[in-house]
Each structure stands twice: as C-alpha cells, then as structure tokens.
C-alpha cells in the first residue's frame, strides 16, 4: 500500500440544495447570541442535546466559544435541557 493513505477512503462531502449542509450561523448574526434566545441556540444543539461542532455549524472559533458559553448558561438557567429528548 505504497500510495494509499487514510484520506483516500473518506466519503466525499455532498453539498446539495436540500439545506442539510447549510450552516445555521450563516443566517444568524452570532455576535448577538444570548443565552435567553433559546430558539437560536437550538439550531446549534443536536437531537441528543450536544453542542454541534464548528465544522458542522460553519462558525468561527470565536463564535463557537460564544455559542458554547450561551448554551451552557441556558442549561444552567433551565432554559435548555442537559440531555436530548431521548431515543
């Protein structure tokens, strides 16, 4: 396996018009994210209740930190659940 690397086996990223790969932060000004704005924060949380990675959401590192802090504050204030809705 002289020419093979682990990168050759990856699936290509599909970017369709269905909106699945659209970053939620592109339509939201991340500078105004507040822990009280639960509707906006839910765009950055998975069904299991985890904060989505910045490579999935398409935000910068600084914006990801703001989002993570806002989500954690909202969880502490019982505006968002710690765990998702379940299976």
Curated annotation (Swiss-Prot):
Basic and acidic residues bias locations: 1-20
Region span, Disordered: 1-24
SUPFAM superfamilies the UniProt entry points to: Ribosomal protein S18
Biological processes, Gene Ontology terms: translation
Gene Ontology CC terms: cytosolic small ribosomal subunit
InterPro entries on file: Ribosomal_bS18, Ribosomal_bS18_CS, Ribosomal_bS18_sf
Alphabetized UniProt keyword annotations: Ribonucleoprotein, Ribosomal protein, RNA-binding, rRNA-binding
Transmembrane segments: none
Pfam family, one: Ribosomal_S18
Sample GO molecular function, one term: structural constituent of ribosome
The keyword Ribosomal protein belongs to this UniProt entry's keyword annotation: yes
Assembly mode: Part of the 30S ribosomal subunit. Forms a tight heterodimer with protein bS6.
Function: Binds as a heterodimer with protein bS6 to the central domain of the 16S rRNA, where it helps stabilize the platform of the 30S subunit.
Family assignment from sequence similarity: Belongs to the bacterial ribosomal protein bS18 family.
Name of the protein this chain belongs to: Small ribosomal subunit protein bS18
Phylogenetic classification of the source organism: Bacteria, Bacillati, Actinomycetota, Actinomycetes, Micrococcales
């Amino acid at each position: 396996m002289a020419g093979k690397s682990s990168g050759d086996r990856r699936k290509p990223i599909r970017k369709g018009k269905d909106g699945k790969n659209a970053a939620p932060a592109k339509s939201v000004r991340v500078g105004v994210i507040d822990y009280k704005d639960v509707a906006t924060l839910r765009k950055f949380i998975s069904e299991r209740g985890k904060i989505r990675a910045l490579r999935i959401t398409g935000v910068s590192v600084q914006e990801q930190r703001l989002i993570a802090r806002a989500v954690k504050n909202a969880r502490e204030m019982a505006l968002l659940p710690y765990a998702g809705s379940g299976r």
